[in-house]
Amino acid sequence: CLLLNTISSCSMMAQSIGSAISGSTYPSDDLELVAVEADYAAKEAALQAEIDNIEISHPGYDEYRYDLDMIGHDPHELAAYLSAVLQGYTRQSAQAELERVFDAQYQLTLTEEVEVRYRTETRTDSEGNSYTVEVPYNYYILNVKLTSKPISSVASELLTPEQLEMYQVYRQTLGNKPLIFGGGSTNTSDSESLEGVE
């Protein structure tokens, strides 16, 4: 009887652990996760290209002033956000939410400014004497400002309390797929090997 109770308890504990692991794993297929990440990175690349080409797309200014935040994101923050909102998602089903996140993360503002400046010109009077005058002219400036915030800030603004809780679980576990977006290592233990060190 004791053996049956022990087996039953172990079985329930295994089910509980299995539920906890599956509840903290990204519910989407790996290929979809990677494809959606690539789509978001492409949006960021397009934004960078737009900024890089401002002087071509908006010609005619005397000066361009840039105040730019960084462009970039943590792929696991994006996957955690989308998983919390959409649960299992595909490349197609995630597009509207990708746009929503992108619009909340990045704000590009172009503002025209006109300064009246003065230049010194030399003129000659009717008697042949030279004199200088300050002549006003318009100096055109295009202010280019990009503000950005991390997806973690976007998440706290846009998610419901329940979604935010799921987002935080996915962030802590990296969806149980820490290497899906490349880089890093699953080994978090201290390294003691001095192999190759002379």
Spans of model-derived segments:
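Membrane-proximal envelope biogenesis segments
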Residues: 1-197
